[in-house]
Amino acid sequence: MAWSPLLLTLLAHCTGSWAQSVLTQPPSVSGAPGQRVTISCTGSSSNIGAGYDVHWYQQLPGTAPKLLIYGNSNRPSGVPDRFSGSKSGTSASLAITGLQAEDEADYYCQSYDSSLSG
């Protein structure tokens, strides 16, 4: 049986007039089952580069977002160790090893931004 590549769709959703997108993610990342994929999150000196933590969320179709990684690289209880997070400079990344069909979802990165306070 031939496997079709999985498509991990990354969407930037903003709601409300106050919302501003300050972190950049690729529109999509794809990989075959069993492979390792990395999702990037690029920020600036006012958020990731300022030392603020990065958090990652996974949203499966028809469900609310679920916390996947907190504090750059920590996994909540119940999250498989196939998921890992890292941060360097003004960017962060989420790695998924041993990609599985159930990993097809939307993934979001989040961080505090000092330029938006006030």
UniProtKB/Swiss-Prot annotation:
Region (Complementarity-determining-2) residue spans: 71-73
GO biological process: adaptive immune response; immune response
Modified sites of kind Pyrrolidone carboxylic acid: Q20
Disulfide bond residue pairs: C41-C109
UniProt keyword Secreted, yes or no: yes
Signal peptide: 1-19
SMART domains for the chain: IG, IGv
Entry GO CC: extracellular region; immunoglobulin complex; plasma membrane
GO molecular function: antigen binding
Record Gene3D superfamilies: Immunoglobulins (2.60.40.10)
Cellular localization per UniProt: Secreted; Cell membrane
Region (Complementarity-determining-3): 110-118
Region of interest called Complementarity-determining-1, as start-end residue ranges on this chain: 45-53
Positions of region (Framework-3): 74-109
Span of domain Ig-like: 20-118
Annotated spans, Framework-1: 20-44
Keyword entries, A-Z: Adaptive immunity, Cell membrane, Disulfide bond, Immunity, Immunoglobulin, Immunoglobulin domain, Membrane, Pyrrolidone carboxylic acid, Secreted, Signal
PROSITE patterns listed in its UniProt record: IG_LIKE (PS50835)
Region annotated Framework-2, chain positions: 54-70
Function description: V region of the variable domain of immunoglobulin light chains that participates in the antigen recognition. Immunoglobulins, also known as antibodies, are membrane-bound or secreted glycoproteins produced by B lymphocytes. In the recognition phase of humoral immunity, the membrane-bound immunoglobulins serve as receptors which, upon binding of a specific antigen, trigger the clonal expansion and differentiation of B lymphocytes into immunoglobulins-secreting plasma cells.
Subunit text: Immunoglobulins are composed of two identical heavy chains and two identical light chains; disulfide-linked.
Entry protein name: Immunoglobulin lambda variable 1-40
Organism whose genome encodes this protein: Homo sapiens (Human)
Phylogenetic placement of the source organism: Eukaryota, Metazoa, Chordata, Craniata, Vertebrata
